[in-house]
Amino acid sequence: MAKNESTGFSFSDVEVAVLKNFASINPSMVISPTGLSVINTAKSVVSFYDFNKPYSFEEFGVYEVPEFLSVLGALDNPVVEVNEKYLIVKSGDQKTRYFTTAKDLLPKVPSVGAKFEKVECELDFTLTADKLAALFKMAPIIKADWLFLESDGKKIRLTVGKELNTSSNTFDVTIAADIKANELKSPIKVPLSDLKVLPGGYDVKISSAGISRWSSDVGPVYYIGVKAN
């Protein structure tokens, strides 16, 4: 789809995919001309995505992003025009009027990048797309609730399961190349319910202070809370 139109704009396929993904974190968000940001209701996940090029529209709020995406998907090559209280979504001689939501009624997303840079991270590694896909594929099969991370300082093991014990079903992958890791006295765990990241590879940094950063090779950055096991 074309990036900008004289009478409006069109989201790219990648931007639509990120919108759909962010809506799984929280369906309500403010859409900015420079990018997207979202925070979940528990405030344990904050995510950001910058557009390749800024748009020229005024930022607007959407209460139900999945519904908004369905409106876009129902039209061929939709073009969006932003008005003060509503959007016009057009395709040829067809159009939909879709009302926006006041920004002060939607979750405010805090800036966390600068704070994260000051946090000491015990784990710093690259998680390839195939390893992430394998973890995500197996997790629902064995009814896993957590992603556990263990390190002896030389390699990092990522395990999905309900618990790390001999009576629980688990699945793990090991990363030994290009890592920066301290030996962990106890595992760090991430709730799989919070790990709503797009498929792909990630540069991952994890701190026992309770936060992790997952930087995608396709653009989004996710800050996700972690816990000591």
Where do the protein language model's features map onto the residues?
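DNA polymerase processivity clamps
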Residues: 2-101, 118-229
